[in-house]
A protein has these predicted regions:
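N-terminal auxiliary segments of SAM/dcSAM-dependent transferases
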Residues: 2-62
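Class I SAM-dependent methyltransferase Rossmann-like catalytic core
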Residues: 14-29, 65-87
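A short acidic, Gly/Pro-enriched loop at the edge of an enzyme's catalytic core
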Residues: 94-97, 162-174
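Conserved class I S-adenosyl-L-methionine
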Residues: 95-105, 123
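Conserved SAM-binding loop of SAM-dependent methyltransferases across substrates and taxa
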Residues: 106-118
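Conserved acidic residues
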Residues: 126-128, 160
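Short, flexible/disordered intra-domain loops and linkers
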Residues: 128-136
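S-adenosyl-L-methionine
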Residues: 135-160
């Protein structure tokens, strides 16, 4: 069961962190590797040492880019789930709290908290940015809550953290 705790329900999607950076790194790594191969092919008959250095430089750039992509994908799909479990698990929940998640995004902390609140409620507030590549929309958060089986305990609200649309002492905890 321990391994399962660090996973989302199948189908729940909490997103890839910095998707544009991941895409750009993958493209740069591929382009660098192709350019290095092309440089090697062109230079090898003229200057072997220079050709080898160009190939080595391109290979290093390609590997560094692939490493960045791999680490980012791992942290987006596994690492942040482990961090979430550590954060949420460290709080002694009663189960009846009202909890606010400020900047909830796709609901990673919001939904994990709602699972610990059988008699409580979890409210997520965010400035939704559907134009970005992250897919940060209230519908995505609510869909993740449905997939995780706690949709009835989750509410999402459009709001700015600098001017929250709630009265004082509306919540027992804020994430």
């Amino acid at each position: 069961m321990r391994g399962r705790a660090n996973q989302a329900e199948p189908g729940a999607d909490y997103g890839i962190d910095a998707p544009r950076a991941v895409r750009n790194a993958a493209i740069a790594g591929l382009a660098g590797s192709l350019l290095a191969s092309l440089s090697y092919s062109v230079l090898r008959s003229w200057h072997r040492t220079l050709a080898r250095r160009a190939l080595a430089l391109g290979a290093c750039a390609g590997l560094a880019s692939l490493l960045f992509v791999g680490v980012n994908l791992w942290s987006s799909r596994i690492g942040k789930l482990r961090a979430r479990d550590g954060i949420i698990g460290a709080i002694p929940w009663r189960g009846d709290e009202a909890v606010l998640d400020v900047g909830c995004g796709r609901g990673l902390l919001l939904i994990a908290t709602a699972k610990r609140l059988p008699d409580g409620r979890a409210v997520g507030v965010d400035i939704w940015d559907a134009s970005g590549e992250s897919g940060n929309r209230p519908e995505a958060t609510l869909e993740n809550a449905r997939i995780e089986g706690i949709a009835e305990r989750v509410e999402v609200v459009d709001g700015d953290a600098r001017r929250l649309p709630f009265g004082d002492e509306s919540f027992d905890a804020v994430l």
